[in-house]
Amino acid sequence: MAPAGGPRVKKVILERLDSGEVVVGDGGFLFTLEKRGFVKAGLWTPEAVVEYPSAVRQLHTEFLRAGADVLQTFTFSAAEDRMESKWEAVNAAACDLAQEVADGGAALVAGGICQTSLYKYHKDETRIKNIFRLQLGVFARKNVDFLIAEYFEHVEEAVWAVEVLREVGAPVAVTMCIGPEGDMHGVTPGECAVRLSRAGANIIGVNCRFGPWTSLQTMKLMKEGLRDAGLQAHLMVQCLGFHTPDCGKGGFVDLPEYPFGLEPRVATRWDIQKYAREAYNLGVRYIGGCCGFEPYHIRAIAEELAPERGFLPPASEKHGIWGSGLDMHTKPWIRARARREYWETLLPASGRPFCPSLSKPDA
């Protein structure tokens, strides 16, 4: 199967999902740009779209080339409650950068909002909704293709976000940063999905906080909740690019390695191919990644689901499927690795003989 030749036809998100198409999301911006020296850890705010636009543009381009069908605006934590006077310029620049890169292909642009810093201490629905509306106003002026409310740990605030995003008539996706135990108030994943569907979300799922397998467990519970309530919604998953089976209800932020010691936990490209296949088999059709997801992880999703999509991403021109490019190596034991069975059964070592396999969460 050859890489796609030239730009594909740009179709709206719900048209794609309604027809059963796979939609490949993009990956993580905060962690990747922090490692590259353009985002400050702790604050995790996206001033880079104004300060270092070429760095953000480059990452968008890498995700697009890797096979992403959607480019999210780099607007995580870009609400007025976190950025004060900078918020409007940052949101506008983020939209422009994503749109500029998307215009080079068939990618859609999604305007993204996330949970506020206010909810935990001041559950003021009116004030929080107004914060969402400020970002929404920029997205509407910039004519993004659809909207995503992501990284919500309380379903009540996620519902408020959906209600606001629906005000402009664009399709709305919503993802919560929860695991199988549910939100931080104990609302189950199934009930979260039901409330979000009834609030009007078109696409429902999870993002961040948890690794591939935990995220898929949560998606299964969401799917069951929707089914039992007689509701229908498209499903979406954008997990971490890290293995986190030992984290608690709060996810990877409670692990002692967060955020600067997570590299030994990075998922391999083959892990992500398995994740993509299992997500697809579960009925999820919008599949991407969040923190820790690099462009090669997105390529892994696109390659695994190439039979369903009908094409490979441009970045596959430089990648042998399941290591097939290794058959040209001069060393026979490396040539022997040019096969799927080898990489699917490999148990990779960390090279750290005195380190534990798992950690104990701090919270």
Swiss-Prot record:
Tagged with keyword ATP-binding: no
EC number: 2.1.1.10
Listed pathway(s): Amino-acid biosynthesis; L-methionine biosynthesis via de novo pathway; L-methionine from L-homocysteine (BhmT route): step 1/1
Reaction equation(s) it catalyzes: S-methyl-L-methionine + L-homocysteine = 2 L-methionine + H(+)
Cofactor notes: Binds 1 zinc ion per subunit.
GO CC aspect terms: cytosol
Domain Hcy-binding positions: 11-305
One GO molecular-function entry: S-methylmethionine-homocysteine S-methyltransferase activity
Pfam families with a match to the protein in the record: S-methyl_trans
Positions contributing to Zn(2+) binding: 208, 290-291
Cofactor: Zn(2+)
InterPro entries: Betaine-hCys_S-MeTrfase_BHMT (IPR017226), BHMT (IPR051524), HCY_dom (IPR003726), HCY_dom_sf (IPR036589)
GO biological process: L-methionine salvage; methylation; S-adenosylmethionine metabolic process; S-methylmethionine metabolic process
Subunit structure: Homotetramer.
Known role: Involved in the regulation of homocysteine metabolism. Converts betaine and homocysteine to dimethylglycine and methionine, respectively. This reaction is also required for the irreversible oxidation of choline.
Protein name: S-methylmethionine--homocysteine S-methyltransferase BHMT2
Taxon lineage: Eukaryota, Metazoa, Chordata, Craniata, Vertebrata
